[in-house]
């Protein structure tokens, strides 16, 4: 087979492969609020989503990123999560290299993010492109980097304001940044200020309106919570979100 024919065959196989994965992605239906969230993401360079737990905001952000990843072969997905420990259990330093220690400290949160993306794109695709077009990392490891693709920062209520600033400054030309969190979802008393709450005050007016053209926000209503109805009562009782 000639070189030109080989190129054509590879191109056809790749197109078929991408169509297969796009069909897989299209099997996942978004609810009305998740569709609204994605519309806000499309309209802005930076989108803040400060909402209750269990509204599907992480899934929705990864779903959007997966669409762009399949549509553009140059698009990258970078997921940033903080290794800050929550609650009273302090596990300290962990053995292993940076990757294993990071996964250990982030525990189920880091694993669940990978699992969602694996459901959307296929575990094989994620494993193949991890470290190439798909990255799971912590704030310290993006210091000095320029991220031109989709940058998703999750659980950002656990960040300090300066760490939030570090993440927001990574956005490259044509990139998008999606900031996820629940500013009231804190499980320990910290001397550091809530980075998400601080950012919301900096970038938006008291009535929620924009201060900057390319920076938007979205909040899910309480009825969007997908866990048992009693969780809504818990959120209401604590007066947080």
Task: Specify the residue positions occupied by each region the protein language model found.
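Conserved helicase motor core of SF1/SF2 NTP-dependent helicases
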Residues: 2-26, 32-153, 157-241
């Amino acid at each position: 087979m000639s070189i030109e024919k080989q190129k054509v065959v590879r191109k056809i196989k790749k197109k078929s492969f991408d169509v297969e994965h796009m069909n897989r992605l299209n099997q996942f239906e978004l609810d009305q609020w998740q569709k609204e969230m994605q519309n806000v993401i499309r309209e802005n360079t930076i989108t803040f989503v400060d909402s209750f737990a269990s509204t599907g905001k992480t899934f929705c952000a990864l779903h959007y990123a997966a669409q762009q990843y399949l549509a553009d072969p140059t698009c990258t997905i970078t997921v940033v999560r903080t290794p800050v420990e929550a609650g009273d259990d302090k596990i300290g330093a962990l053995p292993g290299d940076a990757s294993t220690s990071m996964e250990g400290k982030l525990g189920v949160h880091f694993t669940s993010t990978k699992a969602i993306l694996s459901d959307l794109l296929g575990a094989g695709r994620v494993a193949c492109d991890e470290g190439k077009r798909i990255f799971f990392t912590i704030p310290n490891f993006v210091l000095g980097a320029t991220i031109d693709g989709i940058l998703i920062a999750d659980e950002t209520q656990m960040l300090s304001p300066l760490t939030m600033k570090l993440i927001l400054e990574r956005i490259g030309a044509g990139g998008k940044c999606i900031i996820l969190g629940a500013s009231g979802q804190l499980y320990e008393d910290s001397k550091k200020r809530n980075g998400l709450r601080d950012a919301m005050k900096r970038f938006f007016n008291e009535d929620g309106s924009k201060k900057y053209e390319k920076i938007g926000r979205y909040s899910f209503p309480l009825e969007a919570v997908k866990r048992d109805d009693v969780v809504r009562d818990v959120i209401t009782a604590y007066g947080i979100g």
